[in-house]
Each structure stands twice: as structure tokens, then as C-alpha cells.
């Protein structure tokens, strides 16, 4: 079990694009059939459709929830009855590549600690409003509560401690029309049986279950480039997102 950043390998590699060099940090995880899901949701299942020893080729069929992936995005239809006709195919290229700002709230005084991992469970407007100036200049905001480390060690989720946005926080973020993407390291952006953030942020791509956010260098948190490319499944209420942070070095 990993509980400190020092023991973790850096989830990134250096690449060159034109005359610039970037550290690219992978904010995704491979999907395992044993992934811990939202309490009450079914886990992924695999069926062997064709076995290579019998047919000469291998082919598997999977039964997956729209929201099993780390990370995943939410379609407009997921928790908004007025938009139930809009599936995950609704997001175009404007949601895929954006300048980004990350606020790291894992060290907040209100953060709780469990199994050596500190995370903030309730994100409020007061945690965000000091960043209003930079939020007005980026296309994506990423909220790190510290729960990314919980996701990475695949521990069961408890509804009482899953991080979420308070109503005043989601209302605050909704006031920035330039923001196309709102990302968080929680498996949901709303508290249980509430849909406020999904309604107030209905015109944005909500990306949940981001991982490895702690690998984004401190000096880059105020401005980096973010890829959040949704795998556009027609009619789905959500789906996997290929998410990478690009930090110029």
C-alpha cells in the first residue's frame, strides 16, 4: 500500500513538440475488473467470446458501467432530466484541449485522514474564490481533493467521505463561461442523491476520478495544458476520458 508521494513513480515522460519540451503526466489508470465502484453499482464483467486456442483469435466482450473508468466523463443526460437526449457523443474538440489551472485542497484544514491519506470531502466556494482571476483565463479547472491517492490504491468507497462540490462552489464555477472542463479526483462531483453540480455545470464536461494529480509539479499547477478526450459512445450517460497534463519544461 502506498501512502506517500515519495514512494510513487512519476506518471509521466518528457516529449518534444516543435521547439518546446513537455513533461506529460498520465492522469488515467488501466481499468481492472476488480475496480472499486460507486457503492451499489455493478463491477465490470468479462465474457470470452472467442478463445485463441479454439478459434485462432482472441475476442472478449465486456459489461461495463458508463462510470467505471478512472477517469470518466459525465454526459449531459447523466443527472439532468432536461438534457436526457444528449449522450456522451455531445462533446466536441473544444472540450478536448485546454489551458488548465489546478487547485490542490488536500492540505486544507478541513481535510480528513484515512489510511494515511488526507483529502477534503466538501469543496466550497471559499476554497475557490481566491483563484477567480486565473479561473477567468483558462479553459479547464482541476480540483484535487487528495482522493486521487485513494483511487490509486483501489479501496472501497464510503458515501459519507466521497469528496464533492458544495452548491456554492458549483454555482461559483458556473459563472466562468470560458471554462469548458471541470475535473475532480472524486468518483462523483455531487453528494449522494443530489444533482446540483450536474445541473449548474450542464454546459461543461465534468471529468471525475482523475488520478496522479499529485504528480503535477507545484510550479505548474497554476497553468498547464490539459487533454481530456472523451471516448464518444453514442447515447451513453458517460464514458472513459483520455486525460493527460502537459507541463512545459
Locations of regions flagged by a protein language model:
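Active-/binding-site microenvironments in catalytic and ligand-binding cores
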Residues: 1-249
Amino acid at each position: 500500500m502506498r501512502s506517500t508521494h515519495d514512494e510513487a513513480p512519476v506518471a509521466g515522460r518528457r516529449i518534444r513538440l516543435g521547439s518546446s519540451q513537455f513533461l506529460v503526466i498520465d492522469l488515467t489508470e488501466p481499468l481492472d475488473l476488480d475496480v472499486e465502484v460507486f457503492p451499489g453499482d455493478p463491477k465490470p464483467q468479462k465474457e470470452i467470446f472467442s478463445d485463441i486456442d479454439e478459434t485462432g483469435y482472441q475476442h472478449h466482450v465486456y459489461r461495463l458501467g458508463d462510470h467505471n473508468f478512472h477517469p470518466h466523463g459525465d454526459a449531459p443526460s447523466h443527472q439532468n432530466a432536461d438534457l436526457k437526449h444528449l449522450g456522451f457523443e455531445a462533446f466536441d474538440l473544444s472540450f478536448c484541449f485546454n489551458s488548465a489551472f489546478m487547485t490542490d485542497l488536500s492540505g486544507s484544514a478541513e481535510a480528513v485522514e484515512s489510511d494515511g491519506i488526507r483529502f477534503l470531502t466538501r469543496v466550497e466556494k471559499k476554497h475557490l474564490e481566491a483563484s477567480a482571476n486565473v479561473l477567468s483565463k483558462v479553459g479547464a479547472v482541476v480540483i484535487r481533493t487528495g482522493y486521487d491517492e485513494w483511487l490509486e490504491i483501489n479501496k472501497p468507497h464510503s458515501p459519507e467521505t466521497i469528496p464533492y462540490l458544495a452548491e456554492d462552489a458549483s454555482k461559483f464555477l458556473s459563472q466562468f463561461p470560458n471554462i469548458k472542463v471541470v475535473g475532480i479526483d472524486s468518483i462523483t462531483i455531487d453528494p449522494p442523491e443530489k444533482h446540483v453540480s450536474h445541473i449548474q455545470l450542464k454546459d461543461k464536461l465534468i471529468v471525475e476520478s482523475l488520478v496522479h494529480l499529485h504528480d503535477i509539479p507545484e510550479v505548474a499547477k497554476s497553468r498547464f495544458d490539459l487533454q481530456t478526450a472523451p471516448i464518444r459512445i453514442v447515447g451513453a450517460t458517460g464514458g472513459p476520458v483520455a486525460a493527460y497534463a502537459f507541463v512545459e519544461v
